[in-house]
């Protein structure tokens, strides 16, 4: 087998020639990834240097080849519920739930009852979701008492969801100890969302009340307990392409199973409230590069896809995405699940439960 050159094509005089040469390079590079090679940081930076809508679509086409070969055509569908909202102790610059910069329009309430959560779990299952994530504000159970009542209540609710529905419960409760990770595992949690949000070097520009390493430690605790890590980040917070690539490389190093990619939808009153929304083609480029770096991972359209991508949402599913968060988000509205199902059908894709790394067989 002849390996693709690790260098991008040199410019030629004709735009058509340049595009054809770029396409050939991307095809060879994507085949290398399909064959089991790993993209280097230098190669990822070369992909990030691709400019122009037509050329970015060529990059997306190559990333889509990787997705088809390594993951198949099933799009993983999940839904979330904000089980406790507002008055958060952390100062994440993107979040309207923070007590440091509260949004008057962001809801504040205590832990929802088991009955309320079960009702929404059933609704999520009816909408086609295969997983249902219980999300809570706060730094996490790690900083609560060992017999924290709310943590115990969430564990009990997880057990009830398993007993009474066909949907798989996930959690996103913040930082956990190894012991708490084991409790979650024993309750039936098989996947836990805990995002890194940004690269190690950019993180302290977004949050100062805890560290990037704190988040990494929790991901490692979850993995050690046998829980799949649903760990990604947010694009469009002012980070560089190097930051985006370093985030993807960190996720590869941690061997996470699922990677939610949120596209910043700036919230009024937050430190990032005036941040310009990401250009949709930059979002597509980032999605494609993540797929090159993470060929077998579940890469998920998460918050902000409607606000940032608009009528171009379908292109993300042609750029490496193989999962979607359906329904509403934590503090913003999503589009109707029926629209998502129609979108998938129009692309010849099937909603369901996507394979984790190492599971897919063509």
UniProtKB/Swiss-Prot annotation:
Q: Which InterPro entries does the protein's record reference?
A: Aldolase_TIM, BATS_dom, Biotin_synth/BioAB, Biotin_synthase, Elp3/MiaA/NifB-like_rSAM, rSAM
Source organism's superkingdom? Bacteria
Which NCBIfam families does this UniProt record tie to the protein? bioB (TIGR00433)
Q: Where in this chain does the entry annotate a coiled-coil region?
A: none
| Gene Ontology molecular function terms on file | 2 iron, 2 sulfur cluster binding; 4 iron, 4 sulfur cluster binding; biotin synthase activity; iron ion binding; transferase activity
What is an annotated GO biological process for this record, any one?
A: biotin biosynthetic process
The UniProt subunit note reads as follows: Homodimer.
Q: Which UniProt keywords apply?
A: 2Fe-2S, 4Fe-4S, Biotin biosynthesis, Iron, Iron-sulfur, Metal-binding, S-adenosyl-L-methionine, Transferase
Q: Which residues form the Radical SAM core domain?
A: 70-305
Binding sites annotated in the UniProt record for [4Fe-4S] cluster: 88, 92, 95
EC number from the UniProt entry: 2.8.1.6
Annotated binding of [2Fe-2S] cluster, by residue: 133, 170, 230, 300
The cofactor note from the UniProt entry for this protein is:
Binds 1 [4Fe-4S] cluster. The cluster is coordinated with 3 cysteines and an exchangeable S-adenosyl-L-methionine. Binds 1 [2Fe-2S] cluster. The cluster is coordinated with 3 cysteines and 1 arginine.
Which reaction(s) does its UniProt entry say it catalyses? (4R,5S)-dethiobiotin + (sulfur carrier)-SH + 2 reduced [2Fe-2S]-[ferredoxin] + 2 S-adenosyl-L-methionine = (sulfur carrier)-H + biotin + 2 5'-deoxyadenosine + 2 L-methionine + 2 oxidized [2Fe-2S]-[ferredoxin]
**What's its job?**
Catalyzes the conversion of dethiobiotin (DTB) to biotin by the insertion of a sulfur atom into dethiobiotin via a radical-based mechanism.
The cofactors required by this protein are: [4Fe-4S] cluster; [2Fe-2S] cluster
Q: What is this protein called?
A: Biotin synthase
Q: In which pathway does it act?
A: Cofactor biosynthesis; biotin biosynthesis; biotin from 7,8-diaminononanoate: step 2/2
Under SUPFAM superfamilies, the record lists: Radical SAM enzymes (SSF102114)
Q: So what family is this one in? A: Belongs to the radical SAM superfamily. Biotin synthase family.
